[in-house]
Structures are given as structure tokens and as C-alpha cells.
């Protein structure tokens, strides 16, 4: 099993963002400290300031901020998914562009975590 962990400022707000913007489902929540969301085969761990992961990291880096990791959301409708994510409080980091295998854009969630939207060529 694999998971992606994002450090977030507010677990409840992040649950709402990922559920509303990308249709993630809440699998488990541990109060304000941590939540586990799922979408298809992706498991996303949202770790708030009270989580043990954030507390451990703060011992090494007291100014810990969201990193440059990113999840990739595969979609057949990159324009509408981008619009929905922006309506939910996200920001565009890199606008939609074309590459040899399809279209992609990079968004930021409200905490600055990166989300790549990818639409493969038929």
C-alpha cells in the first residue's frame, strides 16, 4: 500500500477542499490531527499541526511548510476540473499546457500543496 502525506494547516478545511474539488472520500479522521482520504487507487493522508508527523518534523525544521511533493489527478476534462478546483479555493501554479503524452496543469491547494491535473491523449 502507498499513500501521499500532505502537511496542512486545517484538516477539516482540507477534507472539504479535496472532497469538493476532486471527489475524494473520507476514509478515516482522527480529530483535528489527521485524516485519510481515498480516490480510486490513491490514498491521501492530511496531517494537521497536531499530528505526530508534523510534530516530529518540527523538531528538525521548526519552520516546516508544505513541500514540493504533488499528487496527480487523472482526468478526461482538465478544464472543468481546473475551474472546480479554483472555485473551491485552489490556485493555478502552472496553467494548462500540452506535452507529448497529454495536457497537464499544476494547481496549489489552499495550503500550497501541489496538485498536477493530467489528461492523456487518446
For the regions a language model picked out, list residue spans one by one.
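N-terminal first-folded block
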Residues: 13, 19-28
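Vicinal oxygen chelate
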Residues: 1-2, 25-73, 81-108, 119-122
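Conserved active-site tyrosine of GNAT-family acetyltransferases
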Residues: 14-19, 85, 112
Amino acid at each position: 500500500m502507498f499513500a501521499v502525506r500532505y502537511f496542512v494547516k486545517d484538516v477539516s478545511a482540507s477534507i472539504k477542499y479535496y472532497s469538493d474539488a476532486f471527489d475524494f472520500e473520507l476514509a478515516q479522521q482522527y480529530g483535528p490531527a489527521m485524516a485519510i482520504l481515498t480516490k480510486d487507487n490513491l490514498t491521501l493522508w492530511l496531517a494537521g499541526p497536531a499530528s505526530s508527523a508534523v510534530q516530529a518534523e518540527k523538531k528538525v525544521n521548526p519552520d516546516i511548510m508544505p513541500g514540493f511533493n504533488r499528487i496527480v489527478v487523472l482526468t478526461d476534462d482538465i478544464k472543468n476540473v481546473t475551474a472546480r478546483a479554483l472555485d473551491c479555493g485552489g490556485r493555478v501554479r502552472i496553467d494548462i499546457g500540452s506535452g507529448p503524452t497529454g495536457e497537464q496543469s499544476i494547481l496549489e491547494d489552499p495550503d500550497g500543496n501541489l496538485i498536477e491535473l493530467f489528461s492523456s491523449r487518446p
